[in-house]
A protein has these predicted regions:
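RNase H-like, Mg2+-dependent phosphodiesterase core
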Residues: 1-171
Length: 171
């Protein structure tokens, strides 16, 4: 990933939640994710979003930045959960009991909801970046290393949202 800010989210859904089609965000179309995002934000008991800048990712590495963003997301919940269901990891320095679930976004509706919230939040930011840096095609490639994106990097150089430690492989 060349791009930008890293997002993670935490979502507490009501016990009787009946939101349909919650699944791994990568398996849903962009329009379905947008639709579900609105439902999640309306029906969730609480949503917390954490983010880390490309500079912070470069400074401490992607894994530690991911943990920081996860801790921030949990800290922003308005309700302290009794248990965290996590997608495959145990978050260090969190005192709430945790259950890591492999492929959790396909097995847990709350993990799927958190995955959708984080992805839609990030995609919306990439669409805003596209207005500032249109030559990179962020609205369409979302910052992933498509051929067009790599060509733009080679032609125009890096932007402040590119991760320095990653793009050096390409330019």
């Amino acid at each position: 990933e060349f791009r930008r800010v890293l997002f993670r989210s935490a979502v507490i859904l009501p016990q009787d939640s009946r939101i349909l089609y919650l699944n791994d965000s990568k398996k849903l179309s962009a329009s379905k994710r947008e639709e579900l995002y609105d439902v999640i934000m309306r029906e969730a008991v609480s949503v917390g979003i954490g983010m880390r800048s490309p500079e912070r990712i470069d400074e401490i590495n992607i894994l530690q930045a991911t943990y920081e963003a996860m801790r921030e997301a949990v800290s922003k919940l308005e309700v302290v959960p009794q248990l965290l269901l996590n997608d495959a990891v145990t978050i260090p320095q969190i005192t709430i009991p945790q259950v890591p679930i492999i492929k959790g976004d396909a097995k847990s509706v709350s993990i799927a909801a958190a995955s959708i919230v984080a992805k839609v939040t990030r995609d919306r930011m990439m669409e805003e970046y596209d207005k500032v840096f249109p030559e990179y095609g962020f609205a369409s490639n979302k910052g992933y290393g498509s051929a067009d994106h790599i060509a733009a990097l080679k032609k125009y150089g890096e932007t402040p949202i590119h991760r320095k430690t990653f793009i050096t492989h390409f330019i």
